[in-house]
Amino acid sequence: MLNLFQHPFLRSNAVVKQPCVYILTSQPYGTLYIGVTSDLVARVYQHRTGEVPGFTSRYGIVSLVRFDLLETMPEAIAREKQIKHWHRQWKINLIESENPQWIDLAVGIGLPSLPLQP
């Protein structure tokens, strides 16, 4: 995994080694991916670059639309499992409760914006 301090787009306000649950999407109302990490910047960077082959790279799931910071990794894992068991509409409601426009939040944590899709 890319170390946060080696990250080429690091900004001083980036989230540093904090357990969190995050939701990525391919596009607004598109395919959703729920994950957990202790290094959000590095993990989202990996998803965006396709560094790790799998579900997100196969379906172009690269836009960060929600993340929740938690105190401990066990709490983050429990929250991830909880959200993964929710109905799709509940997940959409969760995203829209704080991000109704489905804006890519990755820019706010230090990553460059995604190129515009045609």
Model-found features: residue ranges?
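Short arginine-rich
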Residues: 58, 81-94
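GIY-YIG nuclease catalytic motif and its immediate N-terminal context
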Residues: 1-53, 57-69, 74-81, 98-100, ...
